[in-house]
């Protein structure tokens, strides 16, 4: 996993960066890698949970139906599918039913965000969702309580399937990123600072769980931004994606943030915003790259 993320980091931030920023990104990458390895807390590899594989594949399909079939935004579709999984798990909690459903559903939904310009045929994306569910079940005892694990796992699933797509000649040219205006950059910064705080409070203080804590506000924000008048010249999808991505920070468990959760959440949200501004991969549109 660390190797794949290193390639992702090099592609997204280091390659093609101005000389003045190369050292900054290189040093930051080393810090991130050290922290990643230090806090991995690897347990034994888990067994492949086939229900989790099926749920993740089904979730990816659900996002495809909403985005490619119903023209919903990728953020709204992903949050809706994730919220459905979270609600199902919450509804069965009292009777100990449907436990463990939310995580593979949300993970598969992230894989389903993959652009049609990357993996054109839906079957590739569904396969990526299933692979993400498989990886998630195997790594069930690794990186526990670290926000972003589900998205990272989805990214690994998509990258794995991309290798097959390249071999089959079915790989797309990739999507293009939205260039933020000055106003949008300010909004991304604000959203990236607020989202972790809201997500963490809903997830742990109110006891909704991390999936609902991330998905429910993301649904609301995606709807509100989509309803803004065109005269404001704000692109709702990149802004709502910033909120969704920053919400992964807020999914981090309290014990990982002790004894100063608020400063850490704000610092991580700020770092997320700065990374969002500089993210310029050769191939955009991969599910899980938030």
Question: What feature does the model see in each segment?
Answer:
Residues 37-40:
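Non-catalytic propeptide/linker segments at domain boundaries
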Residues 61, 65-68:
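N-terminal, Lys/Arg-enriched amphipathic/low-complexity engagement segments
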């Amino acid at each position: 996993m660390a190797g794949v993320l290193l390639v992702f980091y090099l592609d997204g931030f280091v390659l093609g960066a101005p000389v003045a920023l190369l050292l900054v990104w290189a040093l930051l990458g080393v810090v991130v890698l050290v922290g990643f390895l230090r806090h991995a807390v690897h347990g034994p590899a888990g067994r492949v949970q086939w229900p989790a594989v099926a749920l993740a594949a089904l979730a990816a399909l659900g996002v495809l139906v909403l985005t490619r079939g119903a023209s919903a935004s990728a953020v709204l579709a992903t949050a809706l599918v994730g919220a459905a999984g979270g609600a199902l798990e919450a509804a069965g909690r009292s009777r100990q039913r449907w436990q463990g459903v939310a995580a593979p559903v949300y993970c598969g939904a992230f894989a389903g965000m993959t652009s049609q310009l990357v993996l054109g045929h839906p079957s590739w994306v569904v396969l990526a969702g299933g692979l993400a569910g498989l990886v998630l079940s195997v790594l069930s005892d690794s990186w526990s309580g670290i926000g972003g694990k589900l998205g990272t796992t989805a990214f690994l699933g998509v990258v794995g399937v991309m290798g097959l797509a390249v071999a089959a000649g079915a790989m797309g040219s990739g999507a293009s990123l939205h260039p933020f205006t000055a106003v949008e950059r300010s909004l991304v910064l604000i959203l990236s600072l607020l989202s972790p705080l809201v997500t963490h409070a809903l997830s742990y203080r109110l006891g909704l769980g991390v999936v609902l804590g991330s998905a429910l506000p993301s649904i609301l924000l995606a709807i509100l931004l989509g309803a803004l008048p065109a005269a404001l010249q704000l692109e709702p999808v990149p802004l709502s994606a910033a909120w969704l991505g920053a919400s992964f920070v807020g999914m981090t468990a309290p014990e990982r943030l002790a004894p100063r959760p608020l400063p850490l959440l704000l610092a991580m949200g700020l770092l997320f915003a700065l990374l969002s501004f500089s993210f310029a991969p050769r191939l955009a549109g991969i599910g899980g790259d938030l």
